[in-house]
Amino acid sequence: MKHVEIFTDGACKGNPGKGGWGALLRMGEHEKEMAGSEKETTNNRMELMAAIRALEALKQPCRVTLHTDSKYVLDGITKWIFGWQKKGWKTADNKPVKNEDLWRALVDAVRPHKVEWVWVKGHDGHPENERVDKLASDAALAA
């Protein structure tokens, strides 16, 4: 199984407002940058979109190390999701899960792969995180 490193970030100009996401996929020497935007969105939705689109870009099942600076994405997919699914997409206090559509899409995007989730501190000089932050910010400005 091939190993792919993925770095993701989301950005929003206003929250809600114009938003963008960026992703960097790296397999050995090969790299691919991706970005996208929405006119009316939130930062959390863009963080989720970055991970979803990056995973969907993989053409075969892979071992993935996915780096994100979003505790929302990291905690959501590694901790909270199991309870949400058990409770019919309700939170611990029985409210509907925000961004359920994207959480469901992320679950589907993860399914074929073996994903290790890694948190990286944002805006701390991490080169790949800085790259995807710029991709996301540029995409948000262009939305």
UniProtKB/Swiss-Prot annotation:
Q: Name one GO biological process term.
A: DNA replication, removal of RNA primer
Q: Where does Mg(2+) 1 bind?
A: 9, 47, 69
Q: Which CDD domains match?
A: RNase_HI_prokaryote_like (cd09278)
Q: What class of enzyme is it?
A: hydrolase
The protein's GO terms of the molecular function aspect are: magnesium ion binding; nucleic acid binding; RNA-DNA hybrid ribonuclease activity
- Answer whether the UniProt record assigns the keyword Magnesium to this protein: yes
Q: What is its main location?
A: cytoplasm
Enzyme Commission no: 3.1.26.4
Q: Which domain of life is it from?
A: Bacteria
UniProt entry keywords in alphabetical sequence:
Cytoplasm, Endonuclease, Hydrolase, Magnesium, Metal-binding, Nuclease
Q: Where does Mg(2+) 2 bind?
A: 9, 133
Q: Name one Pfam family in it.
A: RNase_H
Give the reaction(s) catalysed.
Endonucleolytic cleavage to 5'-phosphomonoester
| Gene Ontology CC entries for this record | cytoplasm
Q: How is the cofactor bound?
A: Binds 1 Mg(2+) ion per subunit. May bind a second metal ion at a regulatory site, or after substrate binding.
PROSITE patterns from the UniProt entry: RNASE_H_1 (PS50879)
Localization terms from the record: Cytoplasm
Q: Where is the RNase H type-1 domain?
A: 1-141
| HAMAP family named in the record | RNase_H
Subunit organization: Monomer.
- Main function: Endonuclease that specifically degrades the RNA of RNA-DNA hybrids.
| Full protein name | Ribonuclease H
